[in-house]
Amino acid sequence: MGVKNYLIEGVSCTGKTSVCDELRRRGYHSINGDRDLAYWGDPKTGEPLDGSAYEHHTWIWDVDKVRALVADQSHAASFFCGGSRNFDRFIDLFDGVFVLEVDLDTLNRRLAARPEDEWGDHVVGDHGRASEREFIARLHATKEDIPKNAITIDATAPLSRVVDAILGNANLVSP
């Protein structure tokens, strides 16, 4: 959707949705991947899964939709914000990749403040919210499901500074 396309990733609670909203507020074309592109599917084939197979690694983006949006160059820049476990199937389409990162205390504080319906037990199976938090803390520590060789953005900073850092690294200024 842009002449330049950027991916903004990170583990849960790093601020991907907030960044997307702030980019939109500033006039940038931004896609909330978790709302507009994601579904539960097989990461290799893209086939949708039934409710019994919902696991963290099956939260994927529709690769054909991503390719179509990237091919549409009606915007000077587009930002794709969200988590996808099949990013390896389309990451090469992006001009830049940013990973939002927070410290463990910030992560735990944001997790505790999340609404009950923000994400369900299906994220890691039927083990409850405590297991979800442990799982997210493990992902935070291992960085096992986020893009490598990305530009790391300190997302503990105020939102305006986080977005300024992304725009600066993309050599963009607010429209």
Q: Predicted regions: what is each one?
A:
Residues 18:
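Conserved Walker
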Residues 21-66:
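Conserved substrate/cofactor phosphate-moiety recognition/catalytic segment
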Residues 53-101:
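Glycine-rich phosphate-binding loop used to anchor ATP phosphates in small-molecule kinases
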Residues 93-114, 153:
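Conserved phosphate-donor/acceptor-positioning beta-strand/loop module used by diverse small-molecule
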Residues 10:
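The Walker A (P-loop) glycine that initiates the GxxxxGKT/S ATP-binding motif of P-loop NTPases
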Residues 15:
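Conserved glycine(s) of the Walker
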Residues 87, 113-168, 173-175:
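Small-molecule kinase domains that catalyze NTP-dependent phosphoryl transfer to phosphate-bearing small molecules
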